[in-house]
Swiss-Prot record:
Disulfide bonds: 48-63, 55-72, 62-87, 74-85
Pfam families per record: Toxin_35
Origin species: Lycosa singoriensis (Wolf spider)
Tissue expression notes: Expressed by the venom gland.
Gene Ontology CC terms, in alphabetical order: extracellular region
InterPro entries, sorted: Spider_toxin_CSTX_knottin, Spider_toxin_CSTX_Knottin_CS
Cellular localisation: Secreted
Propeptide: 21-44
Major localization class: secreted
Keywords, in A-Z order: Disulfide bond, Knottin, Secreted, Signal, Toxin
Name recorded for this polypeptide: U3-lycotoxin-Ls1p
Length: 115
């Protein structure tokens, strides 16, 4: 009985040690991957395409507005066969930003009155 108990304790100890090393390896891999993604995002953020500029070279390069990212919208001009792509803000997002701005302004007034 003592042998089985000793063997069980040894087995649990080895299992916990191996799983701890495995989790450390996963954490390190996740951390390295996260850092590389952050670096790529920062590099891409510096090279964003402003609103109403051509985004045909990279359709995911549009800049962010205050709350939302602009969208690369492509269309064919009247009487033309060439596709033109520009970074634009969809109207529903434009209205949502205006509403959020007004709510923020109104919240500031309430805070000023009662603050």
């Amino acid at each position: 009985m003592k042998f089985v108990l000793l063997f069980g304790v040894l087995l649990v100890t080895l299992f916990s040690y191996s799983s701890a090393e495995m989790f450390d390896d996963f954490d390190q891999a996740d951390e390295d991957e996260l850092l590389s993604l952050i670096e790529k995002e920062e590099a891409r953020a510096e090279e964003c395409t402003p609103r109403f500029y051509d985004c045909s070279h990279d359709r995911h390069s549009c800049c962010r507005s205050e709350l939302f990212k602009d969208v690369c919208t492509c269309f064919y001009p009247e009487g033309g066969d060439n596709e033109v792509c520009t970074c634009q803000q969809p109207k529903h997002l434009k209205y949502m930003e205006k509403a959020a701005g007004k709510a923020k302004k109104f919240g500031g007034k309430i805070k000023k009155w009662f603050g």
